[in-house]
Swiss-Prot record:
It comes from Pyrococcus furiosus (strain ATCC 43587 / DSM 3638 / JCM 8422 / Vc1). Belongs to the SRP19 family. Part of the signal recognition particle protein translocation system, which is composed of SRP and FtsY. Archaeal SRP consists of a 7S RNA molecule of 300 nucleotides and two protein subunits: SRP54 and SRP19. This is Signal recognition particle 19 kDa protein. One of its GO terms (biological process) is SRP-dependent cotranslational protein targeting to membrane. GO terms for molecular function: 7S RNA binding. Keywords: Cytoplasm, Ribonucleoprotein, RNA-binding, Signal recognition particle. GO terms for cellular component: signal recognition particle. Signal peptide: none annotated. The lineage of its organism: Archaea, Methanobacteriati, Methanobacteriota, Thermococci, Thermococcales. It is found in: Cytoplasm. The keyword Repeat does not apply. It comes from the Archaea. Its main location: cytoplasm.
Length: 100
């Protein structure tokens, strides 16, 4: 099982890859919240090890305040980081579709 850090900016469709988005824009979600990421990870049976809501991804220190998303989640997943992030983004999209 791989252990890695997930930053909300890695899933944020408003950001370019230069500022840390990892998933393709077609899968990414707008302004993902830490709670959504944790809920998606738990539903996918990933182990949530630590959640810190006040952390800022160092890549975001030089951009506009409105694009900064705070939070950091440490996960353990049977997949690699890229695949795990894609699954989480898809699950968040599913949650948002259901609630809309």
């Amino acid at each position: 099982m791989g252990r890695f850090v997930v930053w909300p900016s890695e899933l944020d469709s408003r950001l370019s890859r230069k500022y840390g988005r990892i998933v393709p824009r077609s899968i990414a979600v707008e302004s993902p919240r830490v709670e959504e990421i944790v809920r998606a990870a738990e539903e996918l049976k990933f182990k949530v090890i630590r959640v810190e809501e006040d952390k800022l991804n160092p890549r975001l220190s030089g951009i506009d305040e409105e694009l900064r998303t705070f939070g950091m989640i440490v996960l353990e997943s049977p997949y690699g980081k890229s695949k795990s992030l894609k699954l989480i983004a898809q699950k968040i999209r599913e949650f948002r579709r259901r609630s809309a």
